[in-house]
């Protein structure tokens, strides 16, 4: 089943810096505190574990100055490339930080995946105080 790219944006309060949030998006320790139960890395391959489900991804790009990171999912059954990308942007006027997530889902699973992102972002907000 073909997956379509979509983005969701979450506004985080301005009481913290992009650098503080960035460590939760770009390190195995940070990712395992909100995104997955456990995250390990071997060179550029990340292993994400959620209870009994394991998924691997290759680190495709990381920009510590633009606060952008992309992981390409290593899925044998997929005919095309899918990835998850995290972008942090700061609004010059409000000073709010936005987390923009790019992901892929089939039409039938998109709503469930957005609900999952909403839940995960609430965890991220709790641990970062945003």
Q: Which role does the model predict for each range below?
A:
Residues 6-9, 19-20, 96-105, 129:
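Short, charged low-complexity linear motifs
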Residues 49-94, 98, 102-106:
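Hydrophobic-ligand binding "helix-grip"
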Residues 40-47:
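Short coil-to-beta transition motif at edge beta-strands of beta-rich domains
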Residues 102-130:
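A conserved amphipathic terminal alpha-helix motif
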Residues 21-22, 31, 46, 59, ...:
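Hydrophobic pocket/interface hotspot
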Residues 1-40:
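Hydrophobic ligand-binding cavity/cleft-lining segments
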């Amino acid at each position: 089943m073909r997956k379509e790219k979509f983005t969701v944006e979450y506004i985080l309060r301005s009481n913290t810096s992009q650098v503080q949030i960035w460590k939760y998006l770009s390190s195995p320790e940070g990712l395992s505190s909100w995104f997955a139960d456990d995250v390990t890395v071997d060179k550029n391959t990340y292993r994400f574990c959620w209870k009994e489900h394991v998924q691997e991804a290759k680190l495709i790009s990381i920009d510590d100055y633009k606060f952008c990171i992309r992981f390409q999912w290593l899925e044998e059954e997929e005919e095309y490339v899918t990835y998850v990308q995290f972008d942090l942007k700061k609004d010059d006027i409000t000073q709010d930080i936005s987390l923009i997530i790019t992901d892929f889902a089939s039409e039938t699973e998109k709503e469930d995946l957005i609900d999952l992102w909403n839940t995960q972002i609430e965890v991220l907000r709790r641990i970062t105080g945003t």
